[in-house]
C-alpha cells in the first residue's frame, strides 16, 4: 500500500488515539471473552479508562523511553502502536527489554503489512536504544495476534495463570 505512512504520535493526536484504542479494546474483548468467558471479569474496564489511557499515552509520547506511532492511509489514522523500555527483574543479566504494549490496525486495513511496518520502526527504535530483546503479551484466545507475533519471531516465554480466591 503506497499511501501508508508511519509517524511518531504528537500530543494533538491524543483524542484520536483514545478513539482508536476504544475500538481496539471492544474488538479485543469480543474476541477473548467470546472464546473464554472466565476472562470477562479480568478485562472489565474502570469508568475512567479513557482518561487513564489518555494520560498514559500522553506520558509515553513525551518520554524518551517510549515510542508511540500512528499508521495513516492518505493522511487518515488507521492504527497505532505503543512500546516502551522496561526494566527486567534485577537478578537477570538482561537489564532492560523493549515492551510492545499496544498494536492495532483497523480491520479494513489488516493483512496489508501495516502492523509489520509499525513493528519494523519500533524494533529499529529499540535497537537504537541498545535494547536487544523485545517482549509482547497476547491472550491465548487472540489467535490472529498470536500468529502474527510468532511469525515475527516471538517465542512463548511465560504463562500467567489466574484463580478466583
Residue ranges and their predicted role:
Residues 102-105, 111-124, 151:
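Conserved acetyl-CoA-binding loop-helix of GNAT-fold acetyltransferases
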Residues 48-69, 99:
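A short helix-loop-beta-strand connector motif used in the catalytic cores of GNAT acetyltransferases and
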Residues 116, 140-158:
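Conserved active-site alpha-helix within GNAT-family acetyltransferase domains
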Residues 70, 76-85, 104:
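Conserved beta-strand in the GNAT
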Residues 1-15, 19, 23, 30-36:
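Conserved N-terminal entry element of GNAT/NAT acetyltransferase domains
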Amino acid at each position: 500500500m503506497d499511501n501508508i505512512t508511519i509517524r511518531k504520535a504528537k500530543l494533538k493526536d491524543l483524542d484520536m488515539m483514545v478513539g482508536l484504542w476504544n475500538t481496539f479494546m471492544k474488538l479485543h474483548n469480543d474476541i477473548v471473552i467470546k472464546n473464554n468467558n472466565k476472562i470477562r471479569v479480568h478485562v472489565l474496564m474502570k469508568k475512567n479508562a479513557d482518561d487513564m489511557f489518555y494520560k498514559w499515552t500522553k506520558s509515553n509520547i513525551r518520554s524518551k523511553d517510549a515510542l508511540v506511532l500512528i499508521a495513516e492511509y492518505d493522511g487518515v489514522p488507521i492504527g497505532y502502536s505503543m512500546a516502551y523500555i522496561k526494566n527486567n527483574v534485577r537478578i537477570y543479566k538482561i537489564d532492560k527489554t523493549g515492551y510492545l504494549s499496544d498494536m492495532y490496525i483497523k480491520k479494513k486495513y489488516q493483512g496489508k503489512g501495516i502492523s509489520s511496518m509499525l513493528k519494523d520502526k519500533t524494533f529499529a527504535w529499540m535497537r537504537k536504544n541498545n535494547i536487544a530483546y523485545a517482549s509482547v503479551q497476547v491472550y491465548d484466545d487472540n489467535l490472529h495476534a498470536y500468529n502474527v507475533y510468532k511469525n515475527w519471531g516471538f517465542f512463548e516465554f511465560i504463562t500467567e495463570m489466574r484463580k478466583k480466591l
